[in-house]
């Protein structure tokens, strides 16, 4: 088991009206965070689950090839610069137990 840290991951980018899906590598946050669950729980007990999440991020942009005219061919994605354990921030994090793999493509796939 690894504590919260940066790791490379393959993700995918695709859009409507662009015929291909591009897979590429970026950095993500992954690993475990210590959580304490009280032995005695009451209705007033609060439970807070820490997750490994972004501390600092930047955004990079790639251009999807062969998009139809009038389609924005650019895809912007987060790049993790540092990670830490904190409460899940639903505005930019996937806090589900099981989500789809980050490199799922619905269209023809190419790698860069």
UniProtKB/Swiss-Prot annotation:
**Looking at the record's lineage, which domain of life comes first?**
Eukaryota
**Sorted alphabetically, which InterPro entries does this protein's record hold?**
Cystine-knot_cytokine (IPR029034), Glyco_hormone_CN (IPR006208), Gonadotropin_bsu (IPR001545), Gonadotropin_bsu_CS (IPR018245)
Q: Which Gene3D superfamilies match?
A: Cystine-knot cytokines
Cysteines paired by S-S bonds? 4-52, 18-67, 21-105, 29-83, 33-85, 88-95
Q: Which residues form the signal peptide?
A: none
Q: Which family does it belong to?
A: Belongs to the glycoprotein hormones subunit beta family.
**Oligomer status and interactors:** Heterodimer of a common alpha chain and a unique beta chain which confers biological specificity to thyrotropin, lutropin, follitropin and gonadotropin.
Q: What is this protein called?
A: Lutropin subunit beta
Organism ancestry: Eukaryota, Metazoa, Chordata, Craniata, Vertebrata
Q: Which gene encodes it?
A: lhb
């Amino acid at each position: 088991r690894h504590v919260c840290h940066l790791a490379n991951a393959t993700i995918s980018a695709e859009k409507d009206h662009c015929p291909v899906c591009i897979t590429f590598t970026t950095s993500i946050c992954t690993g475990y965070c210590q959580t304490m669950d009280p032995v005695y729980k009451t209705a007033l007990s609060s439970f807070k689950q820490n997750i490994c999440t972004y501390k600092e991020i930047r955004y990079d942009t790639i251009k999807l090839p062969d998009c139809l005219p009038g389609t924005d061919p650019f895809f912007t994605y987060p790049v993790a610069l540092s990670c830490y354990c904190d409460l899940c921030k639903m505005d930019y994090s996937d806090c589900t137990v099981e989500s789809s793999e980050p490199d799922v493509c619905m269209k023809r796939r190419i790698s860069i």
